[in-house]
Structures are given as C-alpha cells and as structure tokens.
C-alpha cells in the first residue's frame, strides 16, 4: 500500500483513481550525465516502481553499480510537491549510517530528476515476506536490531521517518538492513517540536497521527511502525490489515489486534510488540530500552544472515553458548549503533534550510542539492565507490608530474588547488633548528630516557625524531634530511578500521590485507592475508614486546576466543567498509630483523584526527574530513590519501613546496607528536 499524505483519515478511504505519478516517468535515456561533476551513468533495467518514481539499475564511468530513482518533472506540478522532493533529498543527503540507504548523487536533465542511491541487491522486506510468508525469531532479532540502530541515528539528528514499513526497508547483498525513502520524513527544530501533518501508510500509521492531530506527533511514531514491522515479519501480515482503509483506522483506534494461535511466537516477542503498539506514545520504550528487552537476550542470536533466508527458512542451531550469544549480540548492536553507550554512522552536514528561490526555465534542483564533495562514511556498507578525483588529489598529481621539475611551479599548483585546513592553535611555537637538532636528540637521549622507561625509549625516540624531521622539512632545512638513505621499502598503512573499544578493542586492516585487533587488555592479535599465520603480541609497559607466532590451525586454546572475534572483525570490515585507497597491489615490506607481521601499537584520538602508530614506527593521521597522511618509519616519505581514495607519495624533504593545506596538516602532526612525547616524559 503506497505512502500517502492525508488531510483527514477519511480522505484515504475513497481515494480518487488517477494515474500514478511514476507513470509520468518514461524510461530515461541509456546514457545519463551529471554535468556538474562530469560523471556518466549507463542506465540498465527497471528494478522497481513506486507511487512517485521508477528505479533503474545504473553503472557509473568507474564501474560502480547503483540504483537511480527517477522522478519525472511533469509529476512536480506545484511548489508543494517540489518542496517535498527538496526535503526528501536534503534529509537523505544528511544521513550516513550502515543501515540507511547511501545517498550517492543527485542531478537533473530537461525531463527528470535523478537520485543515485546505494543499490540494495536483495530488495525489500516486503518481497522477502511474500516469498517466505513468515520469518524466524533469530532473523527478526537481527533485523530489528539494525532497524532500531538506524532509527536511533535518525532521531539523534532530529529526523522522524514517518513511513517505516516493509517496502521501505531494503536488504543489501549481505542481508543487512537499509532503510530508504525519506519522502515523508520530518526534520524537527528541537526535541520538543510536534508535527501536525497526517501522513503515512495506512497499515503502519501511529494512532497519534490519525486521532491526535491537534497535539501533534514526534519520534514515537517510528517506534509504533517498528512494532507493526516486527509483528508482520513474525506473523506474516500487519496487525491491523484489512481490505478497507476505514476498517484499518477503526482497528488502530481501538488497538484491536491479536496473535494467531497457529503461529509459534514467544512470550518475549509478544511482550515487545505489545509495548511498541501502545496507544500512549509517552509510555512506549526508548530505543535503547527496546534493545534491552528480554526478546533480544533469549533464543539464538546470529552475527550475520545467510543467503538461505532469501528463499527458505534457515535451520538455526538448537543451542548457543552464552558467550557466543553475547558476542554476536554485542557485535550486531555495536555495528548498528544501538544499545546504551553505542552509536554508529557519521555526523554529516545537517540538512540545510530549504530554498524557495524562483526557478528559471526547466531547472528544478537548487545548486545546493548537488554536493561537490561526497563524504565517504567511516563505516559504509555496499560497493566501493571511485568518484571523480578531488582538487587535492588532482593538485598532488600535478605536482608529481610537473614537467619542469621546479619547486616553484609545484608550489603554485598545490597552493592554488588545495582546500584549506586550519589546525588548532599551536602548542609548539619554537623555531626548528637545522641538523643539529637530530644530533642533539641523540646526545640528550641517555639522560631523558630515564624518564620514559625501557619499553617507551624506542617509541619516544621515534616520536621525537619524526616530529623534528617534519619541522625541519617545513622550514626548508632539507640538507638535514639527506644524511640518511631514502625509504626503499613500501610503506604499509591502515586501509580499514572499526572501533569497538567500548567492548573489545579496535580492529583494522593493513594495505597488505593482513588484519589485526588491538584489544582493550593491551594485547594484539594478527591474521595474515592468506589466513595461515596468527601472531599474538603482548604490550607490557616496561619490557620489549614479545610476539608469539602460530599456524592458524594450531592456535592455543587461551586465545581462540580472540581469534574468533578477530574473524568477526575481518568479516565485518570485508563486507561493510570501504578501503582508504582504491584497489592496488601492495608489495609486502621486508622485515630485516624478524619474520613478524606489522601491527598497530598505539592509537590516539584528537580533535582534528585519529592517529595510528604501527610497530615499525609508521605514523598515520586520519583527519575528520577523510583525508589521511602517512609518514614512513624513517620520516623520509609521506603518503597522502585524499577523500576520493587516491594515493600519492611525496618526499618529505619537499615539504616547503607543499600546498598550504598539506603543510598545515604536517604542522598539526608535528605538534601532536611533540605533545605525546612530552606526556611520555612525565607519565
């Protein structure tokens, strides 16, 4: 049943028959072009049709497959419908959560408006339920956890979806929930604001929308709809379903529904549904309280859903250990950002106030609806994107490919093209001296190392030398950097990471495809790219780190639970996260001193970035605007990864010729390292 905006409940009872707005949308051309970004899309088959749009499979000129939601301009007859579309676009653009359909692009031609969205290969829960008739409780437990995580994220951003239903809840290729269609979404100015519009899909509308329009409604309407969804998944149809809309509303008003005796449903599931389908919105449970309900803590808890669910009822194990249940529950809850203390998603730009400027000619979309920079979320599910190179990456390539080789030409290109980055006020204001600083560092090492302890000494030297070399490079003291051989070995860096430090630790993947977890108990577990070798490392405070290497098939019992958790991290990152760089072949660095793998030894969050330090002294700074700077272990070379995931290597000795943006980032890195070294001396 289509979503409708309803002035009065009775208007939905006897709607006038008229052509769907989507019928006004003819099949668009085979080749589509976003003129602003100069991105081309090839249009393929129609994969869906709703009340107001048609959906087509498209492929961009980088080979990425998306879904294009196509709205005919002829269907936008008045300012009200145009503003409604603008609102949908701006709200959806502001969303960045692993369980919300990704918004990729937006553009128009003379006939249509195109919304390029993340493709959900396994379609909607409506289509799944048509095939399956009913789902099992473990499936519903998993899906509801992700639905609630997406709702928690929306509500935190003061967005009410208002049209949560089976048809708007999609599944990606890994059977993860993706909530879409923000056509009826409302953005609140503050948490106390109430919305008055009567809107929604009859089977899912909360009673306060229909019958308390004077008092208005708020976030709780989405929880009512979530209860309807949960009931439908377990029973096979919505609780108030009827052929007549008038009867549906009568049942909603009376809260008249029941649980069929021929359906096996647990008491916990019934209780949770009943609490969500409470007429008084003020006593519906909060989202985190819902996840704390007994329904989510009994039965079987899956960490993923197999493709088997798409066509048949899965057979779940008859029993599950408490540790396995809790681990899977924590994993799914943390990934979706639901549960007390958890959050997921990226705080993107808040929705802009809608523009009501007059529109010239055939143009409908304001320019602000086509963002020039698409910010990739830290946690992202779906195909990896390869957008048009950013200004930063273009400038860096121009600098590296400069034909005359002069520093002046490179300075001009980099400075003119890069965007500015403003670091926090410097805590280190002294001028950096030339080569004597590194020599004096060595001379003073003995007296100062007594302050930092045995284990910290090598780290302290690494941090101080890196900070000093960056400072000298920025001040054009390049002669101080030529006394050592340039880096000849490839530089590894972190391509993916996910933070579960509230429960376990921080997981990451390196550019050689090895995977590791830095656990909260100061241990690290590493898994080689070929999954044949496991390395376990302790991080003692005052002695040298001692790694233990095992064949993957002979891991001791004492660390098997950590290995299982690492595999969960690996699986999650493989399915859900984009790499920091486009796919390339990376040569594995040779280790002259041992056969051990590199691992992340330290990480530090600051206001501007998160810093990682690898065990061989490589530093990596991931800035909040998704640009990354990697500094080699000898501080001879840096790698710049821009937010479009392009990778450029530059010699640090040319820092004086870098763009103001990159120089500012290096200054910030230097200051952070200096501050860290100082703290090591006094800790």
Swiss-Prot record:
Function: Serine/threonine-protein kinase that performs several important functions throughout M phase of the cell cycle. During prometaphase and metaphase, phosphorylates the kinetochore component dam1 of unaligned or unattached chromosomes to promote mitotic sister chromatid biorientation. During meiosis I and together with moa1, required both for mono-orientation of kinetochores on sister chromosomes and protection of centromeric cohesin from separase-mediated cleavage. Behaves as a 'septum-promoting factor', and could also be involved in inducing other late events of cell division.
Protein name in the entry: Serine/threonine-protein kinase plo1
Result when mutating residue 493 to L: Loss of function and impairs interaction with cut23 and spac6b12.08
Quaternary state and interactors: Interacts with abp2, cut12, cut23, dmf1, sck1, sid4, spac1006.03c, spac6b12.08, spac26h5.05 and sum1. Interacts with moa1.
Effect recorded for residue 139 to K: In ts allele plo1.ts2. Impairs kinase activity at both 25 and 36 degrees Celsius and impairs association with the spindle pole body and bipolar spindle formation
Domain Protein kinase: 41-296
Organism: Schizosaccharomyces pombe (strain 972 / ATCC 24843) (Fission yeast)
Chain intervals for the UniProt region annotation (Interaction with cut12): 322-683
Effect ascribed to mutating residue 197 to V: Loss of function
Residue numbers spanned by region Localization to the spindle poly body: 317-683
Entry-linked SMART domains: S_TKc
Matching PANTHER family: CELL CYCLE SERINE_THREONINE-PROTEIN KINASE CDC5_MSD2, SERINE/THREONINE-PROTEIN KINASE PLK
Gene: plo1
Main location, first listed in the record: nucleus
């Amino acid at each position: 049943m289509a979503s409708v905006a309803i002035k009065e409940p009775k208007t939905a009872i006897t709607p006038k028959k008229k052509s769907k707005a989507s019928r006004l949308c003819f099949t668009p051309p085979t080749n589509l072009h976003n003129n602003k970004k100069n991105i081309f899309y090839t249009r393929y088959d129609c994969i869906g049709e709703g009340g107001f749009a048609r959906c087509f499979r498209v492929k961009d000129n980088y080979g990425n497959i998306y879904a294009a939601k196509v709205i005919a301009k002829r269907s936008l007859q008045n300012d009200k419908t145009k503003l409604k579309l603008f609102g949908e676009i701006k709200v959806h653009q502001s969303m960045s959560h692993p369980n919300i359909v990704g918004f990729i692009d937006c553009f128009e031609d003379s006939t249509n408006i195109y919304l390029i969205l993340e493709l959900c290969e396994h379609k909607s829960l409506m289509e799944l339920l048509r095939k399956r008739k009913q789902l099992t409780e473990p499936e519903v437990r998993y899906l509801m956890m992700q639905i609630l995580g997406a709702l928690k994220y929306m509500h935190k951003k003061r967005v009410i979806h208002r049209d949560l239903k089976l048809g708007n809840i999609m599944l990606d290729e890994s059977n993860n929930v993706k909530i879409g269609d923000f056509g009826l979404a409302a953005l609140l100015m503050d948490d106390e604001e109430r919305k008055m519009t009567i809107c929604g899909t009859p089977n899912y509308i909360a009673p306060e929308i229909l019958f308390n329009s004077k008092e208005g409604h708020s976030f709780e309407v989405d929880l009512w709809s979530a209860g309807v969804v949960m009931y439908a998944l377990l029973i096979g149809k919505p609780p108030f379903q009827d052929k007549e809309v008038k009867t549906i509303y009568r049942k909603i008003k009376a809260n008249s529904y029941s649980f069929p005796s021929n359906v096996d449903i647990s008491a916990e599931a019934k209780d949770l549904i009943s609490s969500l389908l409470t007429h008084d919105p003020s006593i519906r449970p909060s989202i985190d309280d819902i996840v704390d309900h007994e329904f989510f803590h009994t039965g079987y808890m899956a960490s993923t859903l197999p493709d088997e669910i798409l066509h048949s009822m899965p057979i779940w194990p008859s029993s599950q250990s408490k540790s396995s249940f809790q681990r899977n529950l924590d994993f799914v809850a943390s990934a979706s950002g639901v549960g007390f203390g958890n959050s997921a998603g990226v705080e993107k730009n808040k929705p802009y106030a809608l523009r009501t400027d007059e529109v010239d000619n055939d143009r409908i979309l304001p320019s602000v609806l086509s963002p020039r920079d698409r910010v990739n979320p830290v946690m992202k599910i779906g195909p990896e994107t390869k957008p048009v190179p950013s200004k930063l990456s273009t400038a860096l390539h121009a600098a590296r490919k400069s034909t005359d080789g002069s520093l002046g030409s490179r300075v001009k290109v980099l400075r003119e093209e890069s965007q500015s980055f403003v670091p926090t006020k410097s805590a280190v204001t002294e001028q950096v001296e030339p080569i004597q600083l590194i020599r004096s560092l060595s001379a003073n090492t003995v007296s100062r190392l007594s302050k930092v302890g045995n284990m910290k000494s090598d780290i302290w030297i690494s941090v101080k030398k890196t900070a000093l070399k960056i400072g000298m490079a920025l001040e054009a003291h390049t002669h101080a950097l030529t006394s050592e051989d340039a880096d000849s070995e490839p530089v590894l860096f972190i391509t993916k990471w996910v933070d579960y430090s509230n429960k376990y630790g921080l997981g990451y993947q390196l550019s050689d495809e090895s995977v590791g977890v830095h656990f909260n108990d100061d241990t690290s577990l590493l898994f080689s790219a070929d999954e044949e070798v496991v390395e376990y490392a302790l991080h003692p405070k005052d002695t040298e780190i001692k790694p233990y290497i095992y064949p993957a098939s002979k891991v001791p019992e004492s660390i098997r639970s950590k290995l299982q958790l690492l595999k969960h991290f690996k699986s999650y990152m493989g399915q859900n996260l984009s790499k920091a760089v486009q796919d390339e072949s990376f040569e594995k660095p040779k280790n002259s001193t041992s056969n051990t793998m590199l691992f992340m030894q330290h990480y530090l969050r600051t206001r501007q970035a998160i810093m990682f330090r690898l065990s061989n002294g490589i530093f990596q700074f991931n800035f909040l605007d998704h640009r990354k700077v990697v500094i080699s272990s000898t501080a001879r070379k840096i790698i710049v990864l821009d937010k479009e995931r392009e990778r450029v290597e530059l010699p640090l000795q040319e820092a004086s010729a870098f763009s103001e943006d990159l120089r500012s980032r290096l200054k910030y890195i230097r200051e952070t390292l200096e501050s860290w070294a100082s703290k090591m001396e006094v800790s």
